[in-house]
Amino acid sequence: VNIDSHYSLKLWEFYVKQMKTLLKPASDTPRFAIYFAPEIDSKLHSIGSQWLGRDSSSGKPIKQPYIKGISSSYFCSVTKTPRRYGFHATLKAPFRLNKEFTLKDLCSKTQRLSALNKPFSIDLKVQEFGNFIALMMDPNEQKMQNLASKLVENLDQFRAPLHQEEIDKRRTSTLTNSEDRNLLNWGYPYIFNDFRFHITLTERIQVRSDREFIASGASSHFSKSLDNATTVSSISLFFQESSKADFLQIQQFTLGK
């Protein structure tokens, strides 16, 4: 597997050392995910990482911006979960690796799939998504949905089956019949026709005035990087050592030309 030159060899070596934990029988084993994440030298990656307070490609903390009307401690708390996952949009949700396959198998297949899809552009804007704040795009944009669907279908062989407790946890949310079928058949509810692209910026924020303050702050913070369309030229492999660990971006796969 060729590692992109932007990525730290030290980080990759750290990851390889953790591979032995994949043999653990417990559910709390490492997970992988395929995300859209901006190129690590892009402005969007930089300001997105700053917003969350962590760079997922290096794992290093970053000072968060000041949001008018919101204390720094509160802002830190409402970005806690997104900070752990990194600045991204989910294409194939986190999964444990099927023991019949290796990391090299997963990377090779992901690289081949990437090469079959051409780069494209999307327009992002700050929106409320339920009680979350997120960067979202036109839901009618088909290229992103098609890419996500291909990844879900063609990489499913690498996904270990969900444990019953994982299914039960997902079902604590209100799922439609379609979402529940997706969960049982593919390991995640929000795929195919139920997919909605979003880059999560906050936890659920129940107080509307707080959501409005933070949404306004996000619009200001991201404004310069969202003036132009965002190019989707790669997809990324993320890795989580355990359920208590943060996700790390360990490789990007360039889309075909």
Provide a role label for each language-model segment.
Residues F222, T231-Q240:
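Low-complexity, intrinsically disordered Gly/Pro/Thr-rich segments
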Residues E128-N140, L237-K244:
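Short, conserved secondary-structure transition motifs
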Residues V16-Q127, Q142, N146-L226, S242-K257:
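Basic, often amphipathic N-terminal segments
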